[in-house]
Amino acid sequence: MYCAKLILLLGCFWISSSASDPADPLLVDLPNGKLRGRDNGNYYSYESLPYAEPPVGDLRFEAPQPYKQQWTDTFDATQPPVLCMQWDQFIQGDDKLAGNEDCLTVSVYKPKNSSRNSFPVVAQIHGGAFMFGGASQNGHENFMREGNLILVKISYRLGPLGFVSTGDADLSGNFGLKDQRLALLWIKQNIASFGGEPENILVIGHSAGGGSVHLQVLREDFSKLAKAAISFSGNALDPWVVQQGGRGRAFELGRIVGCGQASDSVTLKKCLKSKPASEIVSAVRNFLVFAYVPFTPFGPVVESPDAPEAFISQHPVDIIKSGKFAQVPWAVTYTTEDGGYNAALLLEKQASSGRELIVDLNDRWFDWAPYLLFYRDSMTTIKDMDDYSRKLRQEYLGDRRFSVESYWDLQRLFTDVLFKNSTEISLDLHRKHGKSPVYAFVYDNPANTGIGQGLAKRTDINFGTVHGDDYFLIFENIVREPQLRSDEEIISRNFLKMLNDFVLSENGTLAFGTCVFQDNVGSSKLQLLSITRNGCENLELESFP
């Protein structure tokens, strides 16, 4: 049904070669009317363009509806996108509420480049654990300096507003993923009006954005929306992406906000629709065991097969094994110390005791580990959960205690369980069951400051190459210093050329600098590109290092 609807919508393309006025490039004509953007020196921006009706009132907890309003006046596209309502880990203090429920927009950034009439397109899905973040969380000055690509940033519903689910057809969940998909359809239909090439669209994302990109790829009709995709440090098999236990969390959410009498999904949904969005989102604090743990209490789920417009109704592993996913070139990545998110927060010194949280793990490991590493709802019994916790501790720390001195072993555990292992599994499954090229790289080149220092609130620890150290060379982020080192400047330009060449490649070839990625499909071994400050190297492996 969803696929049929997509084909119908794609059949109604509204593409006009004269949609942008050559005499006034800030003025763009869309089916909804005219809009005016901003001149930023070396690029134009057209921000906060609605692609869906506001998901409020009766449209809360429903699949997004295409935006149909007509503008009688010229739409002001100079306003930066608002955050979707969220409980933001990176806001200091107890009140972490931010954003607005009416937030479903895309923002378009077009180079000033008189040497070409049209541009390939990169669509970005932001990260933030499916709980926070936004289209404006990453900058785009590095990206736009090359002048070769149009960038489109997507906003989508987050946290309980985007992902609460009772596991049945009545409150199916995955609303944020459905938002992303409708935004991709909007881009396909409208980007030509901005000078974009609808036949050359690359979709990328980092962390939860990377997991989102992979989930989009796992829909067969994604091939009608994009030409290729890259998932940076996040994929559909990461244990924090698609989780179990959603129904219990949905009814617990209802109890917290005053829907305690709801005994079925229909009643719960009706009650939740009547509550202020701020109350629903603020209830996230009740699902956190300590600090911002677990970092994804609400995220993607496997929907009931009878759910209307279900996004996925099988586990990603089963979808990949079936071969019924989009056959487009896809790359998946990780960094050598990706687990710095969220392990680094355990090194923050507590105001009350003056000691680091990591010390408390010695007494709380069996309580906290299932939430830190996302196996609380996947284990059948408490004994299974405790046995796994014990196994992990023994494997990575042996008989040593948790301390600042043993932090790197804990961070290695986080990297393996939350990122690296599932990246290898995804790659292995795709090479066995896919037809289009599938690539992978590992990045090892620590930033001077990054997300590790931000979470730990200290600069005396070496965290290695943590979550985002590669992606933030493409899109600036406040967790690191804006000035790039000379080696990072080279890598940044190589990344941008990699994106440009990938989206234009007719056979799905991917290259970085002097290295051409090796395709994993049909390969007897894993093909992994290693990227460091000294260059790049193709590795052929039995398993990831």
Swiss-Prot record:
Signal peptide (from-to): 1-19
UniProt effect for mutating D170N: In strain: GB-4, GB-139 and JR-38
Keyword Hydrolase: yes
Effect on the protein upon substituting S523R: In strain: GB-139, GB-329, JR-142 and JR-460
Effect ascribed to mutating L26M: In strain: GB-4, JR-126 and JR-460
Effect on the protein of changing L171F: In strain: JR-106
Record field: catalytic activity: a carboxylic ester + H2O = an alcohol + a carboxylate + H(+)
Effect of A23V: In strain: GB-115, GB-336, JR-38, JR-106, JR-198 and JR-382
A single Gene Ontology CC term: extracellular region
Gene3D superfamilies, alphabetized: alpha/beta hydrolase (3.40.50.1820)
Glycosites: N113, N421, N507
Subunit composition and interactions: Homodimer.
Protein known as: Esterase-5B
Source species of the chain: Drosophila pseudoobscura pseudoobscura
Gene encoding the protein: Est-5B
